């Protein structure tokens, strides 16, 4: 190789000297190549020239004699500034480096062929996008636009042009390295295997990327042209994903085939592998097939409101994600994420509330039974309200307003209202329902009707004594509390002290009366005072009538002396016997004797109080009857005639009230006469 270097002087007045071929020849170290050197010094004025004059060298210097290609020469032109004279060695070393590089490239043709392949790969990897950005900035002045990454040009270059350039560079690289023969057979075999692998994977990846980008672009085009709420978008998504998956599966199969592996065995695997796949991956395979069914049939799509019941758990929410292998995600009403396996949707009922065409209004309005005369007009006006509402469906579906039934608990008149709102949105349905209910309540208020309220019956529980003494009207209708006199029971020690103070001290010849006799005498003394109090309270019973009653009581006592006398004597005998036995036992102990006397007195007092309580209840019965007869002025006449009269007349048909009343009165008279005779 011959290298020719030329140094060009510059003058201040821009006079350019043509430099011809030098007269001297300098042999190189090898003795083969000749380097022509011509040195021309610059004048003193040229040293003061501006550096800009150097840029005019090429345009003003004229033509330089070219070197023939047959000489295989490399021409290096340089402009040297005046200095210490070190320019020669630098220029010479540079020429030597270039000479060696050129000789190396010329001696090995495979390296020369690698340059375009490596250049294509480097350009596709690092130079394509900057070049596109530079062209966009130069032509459209939109280099800083944020949407440049999403432009169609960017998408085409990155999705189609870049994979093809990478594939071209890989193929050229493999073609260049294929003729190279390595010294060892093992290295040659490894080289061939690697080249086959590189060709296969580059081909599969390049065309798979282009095909997948094309499928995504087609899917995006069809989904953008349709309505976003259209359910066909889910079908396009399913088709795109299926073809996308199939493309990559085919690419993997092709890659295995290009490597020399047979994919038929993998695709038609059976026997033990199928059994293991069935047992281990049954749930995964079931979910995958169920997801295919969901995408194909589209029972629900994204952002739809569904309701289902899975394992006894109510699920209601918006569909957030429909997975292939992963579960479907439902965003609940409380904003919780519910993950449901896809195969659950194929075996359970799913309600899609978003796909509703109408929402139903169904309710009951209960009118009071007191407004039964207004029910016809109320129902008619309610029908008019629904027929005039434009948001209520009038033609396709029913519209019902009827008096459905009567509530057996409170006798309320229940009106059925059933209609459909022409909307699929739940919020709009609630607004229409609110307006309809307010209009129906306005109709009820316009007619002066009342809504029914619950009716409760409160009953008072009475004991047997109160049931015997209370009137029938008080028990069934009035349920009023009885104004009865309460009996005052004094303690036993006070009664004993009163008896001791009132009774005179017995003479030595007389015996002291027993406690039973004392109590009987006390009862006989208290009876006239009670009868006197009753006559004072009644105020209408004359003295002659009281005397006649006393005479009748005396006659009755003579007739019943044998029976009642015997009964009283028999009842008093055990008490007397017990008192005598206790006295005998307590002769030695005076304190014990006093305690025994007190206990005997208490026993006799309890018996007398029981008999007096029975007499008092009978007397209070008579007083309550008199009070009922005298208090008719306070109670209303309408209640007395309608409520009590009708109820008593109706009850006489089933209950023998008169007979029981007469029997109870006779029994009371006989008991009073018996007590008086005693």
Swiss-Prot record:
Query: Any phenotype upon disruption?
Result: Msl2 and msl3 double mutant shows abnormalities in the size and shape of plastids with enlarged chloroplasts containing multiple FtsZ rings.
Q: Which Pfam families match?
A: MS_channel_2nd, Msl2-3_C, MSL2_3
One term under GO cellular component? plastid envelope
Q: List this protein's GO terms for biological process.
A: chloroplast fission; monoatomic ion transmembrane transport
Major subcellular site: plastid
Q: How does it sit in the membrane?
A: Multi-pass membrane protein
Q: How far does the signal peptide extend, from start to end residue?
A: none
What tissue specificity does the UniProt entry give? Widely expressed.
Q: List the disulfide bonds.
A: none
Membrane spanning stretches: 104-124, 154-174, 194-214, 242-262, 266-286
What is the recorded name of this protein?
A: Mechanosensitive ion channel protein 3, chloroplastic
Record lineage: Eukaryota, Viridiplantae, Streptophyta, Embryophyta, Tracheophyta
